């Protein structure tokens, strides 16, 4: 055991661990979610990149010596490589605007650096968590900058599963291009379309959301490093701000820049609201698609039954043979959670006061949660559902030609009123629109056959109005 102290007192720390007294206090104070920092490696890596960039800038400015720079950078590289992540034990939701997370990072890096230099853990006179690792920084610029770097990476990582889903929908659109079916508005028969057109809209929806995700990265490119406490830059070197921008670009390989006004950037959480809004947009639209898939596959005998979803597992403990649309159902629920997380982000952003928003920990927690579950849900929907969807072509075809909705195709030829009369009689007699129109000799068989050709009902079509 080793003894560490702070201005509150002292505590015994196990010699096996790399965190220190402030981390231990935080772990005892905040047992809220049981989701610890170690559950989010992207945040640990981005925070380590911030600390490495700071060490490089501080060394160049002569604020720390070369030996310390090398040791701190070595420790940061270990964290970026995924090592020692079990040492990050603070709860994701915490009081103090993220200070506990920042100090967990400072203490682990300091003790890793001490070992690298041949010292014992806790010998902070050689490498101090605050004086050396946290030099030229405050939690108030280090935490949000690390968070934005992590969000940038999560946005980038979300693109691949979204592209896979888009491509799966596009492939189904090609497969189903010849399958004519009934389009519906307000759950009532409308006009014909193809199943391919339906799936093409899903592919386009995802493609547009991919554009939104890529654009959202620009909202988190602007950091507030060098602002320290409230953005004024107290306790930082006059050249630190320009230098840290170059160093963070070198360390991350990403086009991050420092905000023009660090005071505004330190208190602003607008970028998080925008990113969360994009995730909510994806969730809302994805949930609607899952609603469609569940409805289109309903049945098999007493529903629409236009498509078949892959059978994943038995659906009932009491009804033999029942299979449920479990994949769209789970994605629906993920989308509900993402939408709820967005509300939490909005409330936390609104809750800021004066020069700092202390609620960034819950913003970080909710955003990371949304990224994780939404990414997994998209992959699950792609591989366990969309790729295996098949069409019930005869059912789709019969719905069209037994539908009252195709009477709309007669409108340009015989007018609305006569078309409505035919629809009314077809409903009353349980006969087809085609048979009623033919029987009344309103149009010839050749004319009706031409009007009701699928290709003439699926897109704009030139016509001549037939005389009464």
Curated annotation (Swiss-Prot):
Subunit structure: Homotetramer.
Purpose: Catalyzes the reversible conversion of L-aspartate to fumarate and ammonia.
Alphabetical list of Pfam families matching this protein: FumaraseC_C (PF10415), Lyase_1 (PF00206)
Disulfide bonds: none
CC terms in the record's Gene Ontology section: cytosol
Name of the featured protein: Aspartate ammonia-lyase
Record key words, sorted: Lyase
Enzyme class, broadest EC rank: lyase
Top-rank lineage group of the source organism: Bacteria
GO biological-process terms attached to the record: aspartate metabolic process; tricarboxylic acid cycle
Similarity field: Belongs to the class-II fumarase/aspartase family. Aspartase subfamily.
Signal peptide (from-to): none
Enzyme Commission number(s): 4.3.1.1
Residues that hold L-aspartate according to the record: 99, 138-140, 185, 317, 322
Catalytic activity: L-aspartate = fumarate + NH4(+)
Catalytic machinery residues: 316 (proton acceptor)
